[in-house]
Swiss-Prot record:
One of its GO terms (cellular component) is plasma membrane. The keyword Transport applies. Its main location: membrane. It is a multi-pass membrane protein. This is Large-conductance mechanosensitive channel.
Amino acid sequence: MSVLTEFKAFAVKGNVVDMAVGIIIGAAFGKIVSSFVGDVIMPPLGLLIGGVDFSDLAVTLRPAQGTAPAVLLAYGKFIQTVIDFIIVAFAIFMGVKAINRLKREEAKAPTLPPTPSKQEVLLSEIRDLLKAQNTPAAPITVDPARTL
């Protein structure tokens, strides 16, 4: 089997395609959450704590010297990334929780045992009659009104 054929068989498998779709959707979802946090959550939060813009928070480790830029420890971006992570983790948690609830409800639904077919009922009756014949103390009774 050639490498190209093996790769084609690998790439077309359902799991690989599903994983690729999940990664692409996850990346797009990450962009949405980052925008939500940066554009919707952080501005009001900054106003509540005194007009601070988290993305600009930094500690200058070395000031700019001539053409060399300043060396900054940009902890504000880190805070924003942590908030992004918390929101994404919470959204995923809620999604998994909903899926698990649906699975539990599906598992709780009682399944009725299948009703036996006519053949199974007749075979059970024949079995019971044969057992009764092999037992000397039990009389054999046949219902003449019953027809096969």
